[in-house]
Amino acid sequence: MHDVVDLRSDTLTLPTPAMREAMATAEVGDDVWEEDPTVQRLEALAAELTGKESGLFVASGTMGNLVSVLSQTRPGQEIILDLDSHIFNYEVASAAVIGGVQTRPIRTERGFLSPQQVSEAIRPANIHIPPTGLVCLENTHNRHGGTLCTPEEIGAVAAVARAAAVPVHLDGARIFNAAVALKRRVREFAAPVASVTFCLSKGLAAPVGSLVCGSREFIGRARRWRKMLGGGMRQVGVLAAAGLVALEQMVERLAEDHANAKRLGEGLARLPGVRIDLSRVQTNIVIFFVDRPGGAQTLVSECAARKVKIHQIGPTSIRCVTHKDVDRDDIDRALQAFTEITRHWERHGGPPANGH
Ligand code: TLP
């Protein structure tokens, strides 16, 4: 039980005592010179887990996705991705601004492009048309509510792209959630794609960092882009040390977060005025809708007054993310707050119209 129940994101997780200890005692060197032994251990472990030749430690998931785009496209090309993908929505148009590539967003049912959608979107050679440079996938899918796709589904999309000589990048910020939920190995999801990014600082609770993995040659290019973006860090083993603890100690417990998300989703489904598709609650994200005018905004502020923090992601939609700093009692407290607020609305004909 925590004083504040913070369901805004799994990025809010605090480092564990074991991480703090590992950070304090980490063996370090200059990583731009490729002489930091702790970073090298982390990158080697990431490569092994993803089944790729090499790994690269980067500052964030955003930087991991960007260096992957930059290393696999050239200006004037187009990347195919889902309309609700993180790269398209939340990465500050970096692919366009820094990479000079055009994004081609495609609407999907659960966040995953089908092989047919990819096949139809790949551009033919024509002087008028930007050549397709990359296909980007996301698993688990953030804006679709932590939805999963299987290694086989990724393989089917990658086969279509491969036939057109187009590489595939996987934004696997939460790929360990997918792996734990489906009881599959991360390397199975990564096998069909040329590059994969995963994050240490979300459900795995490290304070900083993501890994990009792919072929040795790809990582060489990504390392140059990282340097150009100002991401060449020096004695960064102090951060990598926490990342090693994240990978060694924090993966299996993600199942608890999934169970808590399910409990939260099932509780929400019983409330008046709340709409939720429980079939989408597959990992640690719960998205639900309050369709009354002003309802979502009012729910956020009334929850905050009860020390329950949730995040509005659209006019009527709210996202809750479970993580290691939210336990089962906290979930029940959040549900208690939702119940009090929505029952009160029910008795008084809805939330105040101005949303306050
Ligand atoms: N997502 C954050 C916000 O940016 C929305 C969150 O709170 O969920 N890919 C995916 C699928 C992500 O969800 C995120 C972060 C990233 C990439 C970027 O990672 P960071 O925040 O490390 O740059």
Name the predicted role of every residue range.
Residues 1-278, 282-290, 296-306, 311-326, ...:
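Conserved PLP-enzyme active-site core in the AAT-like
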